Regions:
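Cofactor-binding active-site loop characterized by glycine-rich and histidine/acidic residues
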Residues: 40-161, 315-317, 321-325
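Short internal beta-strands
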Residues: 66-68, 167-170
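Hydrophobic or amphipathic alpha-helical targeting/insertion segments
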Residues: 158-160, 164-169, 175-177
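Glycine- and acidic
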Residues: 7-12, 31-39, 103-110, 243-247, ...
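Long, well-ordered, tryptophan-enriched scaffold segments
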Residues: 173-318
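Residue-level preference for the first positions of well-ordered beta-strands
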Residues: 136-138, 164-166, 270-272
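N-terminal amphipathic, basic-rich helices that act as targeting or association modules
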Residues: 1-78, 250, 254
Length: 329
């Protein structure tokens, strides 16, 4: 399957039934490539299915994906025609380990540490709306980066603007506890179902026409629904900020993610999709010790042990060497 991916949108030619095989081939490619060059492995192995699902429901480069930090964008780079560049990953003159606009029209934002993807995505959203254009903007942020103050400032701003904007929370269980999955997923689907949305609107309009008591009944229904949701959906933190919350969803089940991402596209206003992933998935050493494979040098695939490589002088070495120089008087 991987040999069929050579340029953006080639993924749309892949049958849905073949996506699991494509995911497996991408993982194997990443393990083999990073074992030779070094790079960020655990985070990239964790978002293979998430990236495939996003690319499947979006139309790049017209639609925009903003990656927070950016070191988890390797699969994105593969899907946008840079597979052959991995042999020069993070080398001078080679492909960057992060999104770079100079590399591809599909790289929306030159990312860096951290918590800035929602703000950057919101900038694209505002530009789109002011220019009267029509494309999707998706910001992908991890639960660790979501602890940054800039992220919450941007969430608040997105809720205030009330414009269409999708935020994907890539939760690999580092900072945010799991929510009540079954009920939350059910209510998320129910809230965004077109039939339910239409029925809710019609019932509200009809009740408001009832003299004296109609409006009171509507207010009571809203308060009751809100109270029940507060009890069973921890995602109400985001709902209370003014964002529609969908999830959580298994970040390694592509069909479920595609369904939820398509639901997010139907939502009017900002929406946050909560995706649960596992760092290092598909490679046992990285899965058991994701911290050791966050940013790794070349390593032995069988054992996971890093290989000794010849290194150049450190900044400290260079600084020390200058202290021995005799300056002219």
């Amino acid at each position: 399957m991987l040999e069929k991916i050579n340029k953006p949108n080639d993924i749309h030619k892949i049958a849905l039934a073949d996506f699991p095989q494509l995911a497996d081939e991408i993982r194997q490619f990443l393990i083999e490539s990073v074992s030779q060059t070094g790079g960020h492995l655990a985070s990239n192995l964790g978002v293979v299915e998430l990236t495939l699902a996003l690319h499947n429901v979006l139309d790049l480069p017209q639609d925009k994906i903003v990656w927070d930090v950016g070191h988890q964008a390797y699969t994105h780079k593969i899907l946008t025609g840079r597979k052959e560049e991995f042999k020069n990953l993070r080398k001078e003159g080679g492909m960057s380990g992060f999104p770079k606009r100079c590399e591809s029209d599909c790289d929306t934002f030159d990312a860096g540490h951290s918590s800035n993807s929602i703000s950057a995505g919101l900038g694209y959203v505002r530009a789109r709306d002011l220019l009267g254009q029509n494309y999707r903007v998706v910001s992908v942020i991890g639960d660790g980066a979501l602890t940054g103050g800039m992220a919450y400032e941007a969430l608040n701003n997105a809720a205030e603007l009330k414009t269409n904007f999708i935020i994907v929370l890539n939760d690999n269980n580092m900072s945010i506890s799991k929510n009540v999955g079954g009920m939350s997923s059910y209510l998320s689907a129910l809230r965004t179902a077109e039939a339910y949305t239409g029925m809710k609107l019609n019932v509200t309009k009809t009740l408001k026409k009832v003299p004296k008591v109609g409006t009171a009944v509507v207010d009571t229904m809203r308060r009751t629904k809100s109270s029940i949701k507060q009890l069973i959906i921890p995602g109400m933190l985001f709902e209370n900020m003014g964002l529609t919350y969908l999830g959580p969803v298994d970040g390694h089940n592509m069909r479920q993610m595609m369904k939820l991402f398509n639901e997010a596209k139907r939502v009017e206003g900002p929406v946050i999709v909560h995706v649960l992933t596992h760092k290092g998935r598909g490679y046992e050493p990285a899965s058991l010790h994701p911290d050791q494979f966050h940013g790794t040098g070349p390593f032995d695939i069988k054992t996971g042990r890093q290989l000794s490589v010849k290194k150049g002088p450190t900044y400290t070495d260079v600084s020390v060497s200058y202290t021995h120089l005799t300056l002219p008087t």
